[in-house]
């Protein structure tokens, strides 16, 4: 029986969720800058009166460089203060796991008309393609498929023309999915010191792209 805190800051909507037996608390907010200013107090409120925390799950990338760092730093801070380990989750898998389907395309905006993309079979929990940083038209899977994640907004017409459907609001935070994946993967938890971000793009190039 475990209580897991999930955190996602890979996109413009940052979120956190707490799950456990008979427990499900979720918070999210669209943030332009300074995610830590709203994220940390929101998590403190989620944890108020909750049972003891057993693990923290956090998305480690790909995604917005600065925002990802805030999320991971926050996760490490809470993990260390509670003396628990961290479950590292792909930000693309977290978004895909919000829907059920044989072909689920998870998309995040990578700036400069590109997306971070990966296709999953969420019915079997398998990965159908590698995570890539590419133009949207090059990553569309065979029809039919479901598209999810903030990157959907870059090409809803393109997705529809390729036989894809959009299952959930592209701006919806996957924080609850992150917490649930963390619960399933408690045995994969690592000490805070072993957590590393997973960029698909060179960090300096990514920071430059985000400034444009």
Predicted feature residues:
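Short, hydrophobic alpha-helical segments
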Residues: 47, 179-190
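N-terminal beta-alpha supersecondary unit
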Residues: 1-65
């Amino acid at each position: 029986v475990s209580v897991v805190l999930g955190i996602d800051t890979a996109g413009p909507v940052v979120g956190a969720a707490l799950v456990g037996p008979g427990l499900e608390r979720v918070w999210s907010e669209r943030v332009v800058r300074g995610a830590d200013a709203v994220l940390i107090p929101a998590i403190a409120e989620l944890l108020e009166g909750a049972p003891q925390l057993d693990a923290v799950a956090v998305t480690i990338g790909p995604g917005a460089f600065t925002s990802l760092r805030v999320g991971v730093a926050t996760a490490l801070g809470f993990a260390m203060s509670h003396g628990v380990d961290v479950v590292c989750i792909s930000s693309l898998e977290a978004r895909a796991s919000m829907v059920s389907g044989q072909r689920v395309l998870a998309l995040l905006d990578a700036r400069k008309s590109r997306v971070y993309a990966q296709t999953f079979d969420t019915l079997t929990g398998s990965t159908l393609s590698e995570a890539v940083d590419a133009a949207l038209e090059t990553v569309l899977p065979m029809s039919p498929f479901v598209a999810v994640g903030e990157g959907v907004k870059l090409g809803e017409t393109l997705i529809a023309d390729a036989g894809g459907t959009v299952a959930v609001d592209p701006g919806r935070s996957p924080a609850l999915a992150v917490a649930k994946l963390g619960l399933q993967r408690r045995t994969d938890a690592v000490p805070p010191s072993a957590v590393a971000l997973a960029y698909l793009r060179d960090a300096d190039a990514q920071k430059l792209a985000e400034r444009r």
